[in-house]
């Protein structure tokens, strides 16, 4: 947790978030109390990665739909003491540091596209980028939900039929 007016930092599970002061409630009103933070780093190399991830790894950028290759994801939620949702005020951001394991770090690009999950649309939306600094991807975000560092790739749909001795299997 941190004080809404002064900001602060929260760390855990390799994830680090530095908050500026300036938090608002769902109506856009200034919030001045203690901000509760629920945050989880979701490691794309973990066996339970898909259990925590919303939707699938399909995103949209200006050129259309893309398949996303994740280099790290974070679920972040801010609430007041009663569980009401909070967000940074307009013009305020928080710096999120996504840890990279050795296998991911070896193939990490200096800058990677940053995506957030749009719950209304049901897919990932490109919103900025993250920079590689000291073995972590760092990004400034202006709202909280699921954030994902991803390399977008084109995808194809392959249709086929499995047969045995010329007879289709069901």
Describe the role of every protein-language-model region.
Residues 1-12, 27, 43-46, 61-170:
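Proteolytic cleavage junctions
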């Amino acid at each position: 947790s941190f004080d809404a007016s002064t900001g602060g930092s929260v760390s855990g599970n390799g994830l680090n978030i530095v908050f500026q002061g300036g938090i608002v409630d769902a109506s856009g009103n200034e919030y001045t109390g203690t901000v509760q933070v629920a945050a989880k780093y979701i490691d794309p190399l973990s066996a339970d990665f898909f259990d925590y991830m919303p939707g699938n790894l399909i995103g949209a950028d200006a050129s259309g739909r893309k398949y996303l290759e994740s280099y790290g994801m974070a679920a972040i939620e801010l609430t007041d003491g009663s569980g009401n949702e909070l967000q940074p005020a307009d013009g305020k951001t928080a710096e999120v540091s996504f840890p990279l394991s050795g296998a991911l770090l070896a193939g990490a690009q200096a800058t990677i596209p940053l995506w957030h999950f749009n719950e209304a649309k049901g897919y990932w939306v490109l919103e900025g980028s993250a920079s590689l600094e000291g073995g972590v991807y760092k990004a400034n975000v202006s709202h909280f939900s699921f954030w994902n560092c991803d390399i977008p790739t084109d995808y194809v749909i392959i249709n086929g039929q499995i047969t045995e001795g010329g007879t289709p299997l069901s």
